[in-house]
């Protein structure tokens, strides 16, 4: 019976949110008021609210603000265009391609280099770059922020670029750009400016729960997963010259790919159902 009661409260509130009767930014009624409305105990109401929090449709509430219906202004990331085709880095205005793409989607965007460090390769990064676990690499961490009228600035993405030491230490005009603690922009990108033309990308996407560090930086609600996009850059010799690992709140980002479909011809011995 207890399960049925909290589910009844959950279903009613979720329906109000889905129909827009409780709109983004609206205050969710207090536990005491909901208990009176439905005629159930506050503990039953709390179970329903906890489920809505885990679904990511209401905030967990803090202090006098209480719980609110979450705003869902999605950030679109066009990965077909990102780092492909006409490279949109703008050295004159100190804007790289991510910022240019964010601007094209209507966002004001900025990024900071939060950290440049020589670290031992974690297992996952070692697999991406095909190096031994513990190999010393340079990690360059950028924090990417977006805002627009009516939407306060928020961290959209943690972008970590991992590079072999032999590449990270290369210099242009006496400066190693991958070791700089500030944003560096070159026509065609840093790696091309260093002499590494990436001829192939391998992308891997996963959804997982955030680490404590990621949850703190992204301000994700309890129970909210993060998305992780890893792009491995490979040069003409087959060498993996870097991996860019981007982590973002799973309820704030939409990834887009446009993929051409090659013409396929049926064969006599293979049946197809399209």
Question: Where in the sequence are the language-model features?
Answer:
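HTH-adjacent hinge/linker in prokaryotic transcriptional regulators
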Residues: 4-10, 36-37, 50-133, 169-182, ...
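Short helix->loop/beta-hairpin flanking segments within DNA-binding domains
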Residues: 8-26, 37
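A short alpha-helical element within helix-turn-helix/winged-helix DNA-binding domains
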Residues: 25-40, 52-53
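Residues in the helix-turn-helix
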Residues: 44
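DNA-binding alpha-helical recognition surfaces that contact promoter or target DNA
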Residues: 47
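Mid-protein regulatory/catalytic core that forms ligand/cofactor-binding pockets
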Residues: 87-228, 234-237, 241-242
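Polybasic (Lys/Arg-rich)
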Residues: 239-240, 252-254
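Acidic, metal-coordinating catalytic segment for phosphate/diphosphate chemistry
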Residues: 246
């Amino acid at each position: 019976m207890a399960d049925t009661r909290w589910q009844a409260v959950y279903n009613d509130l979720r329906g109000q949110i889905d129909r827009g009767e409780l709109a983004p930014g609206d205050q969710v009624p207090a536990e005491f008021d909901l208990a009176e409305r439905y005629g159930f105990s506050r503990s039953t109401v709390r179970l329903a609210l906890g489920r809505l929090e885990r679904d990511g449709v209401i905030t967990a509430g803090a202090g006098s603000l209480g719980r609110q219906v979450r705003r869902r202004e999605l950030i679109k990331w066009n990965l077909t265009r990102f780092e492909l085709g006409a490279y949109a880095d703008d050295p004159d205005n100190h804007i790289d391609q991510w910022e240019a793409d964010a601007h094209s989607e209507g966002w004001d965007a900025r990024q900071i280099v939060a950290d440049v460090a020589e670290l031992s390769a974690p297992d996952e990064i070692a697999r991406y770059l095909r190096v031994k676990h513990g190999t010393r690499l340079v990690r360059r961490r950028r924090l990417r922020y977006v805002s627009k009228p009516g939407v306060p600035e928020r961290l959209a993405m943690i972008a970590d670029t991992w590079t072999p030491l032999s590449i990270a230490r290369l210099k242009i005009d006496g400066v190693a750009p991958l070791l700089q603690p500030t944003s560096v922009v070159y026509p065609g990108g840093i790696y091309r400016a260093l002499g590494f033309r990436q001829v192939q990308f391998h992308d891997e996407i996963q959804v997982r729960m955030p680490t404590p560090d990621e949850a703190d930086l992204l301000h994700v609600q309890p129970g909210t997963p993060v998305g992780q996009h890893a792009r491995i850059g490979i040069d003409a010799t087959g060498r993996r010259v870097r991996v860019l690992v981007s982590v973002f709140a799973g309820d704030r980002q939409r990834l887009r790919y446009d993929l051409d479909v090659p013409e396929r011809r049926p064969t006599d011995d293979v049946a197809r159902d399209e």
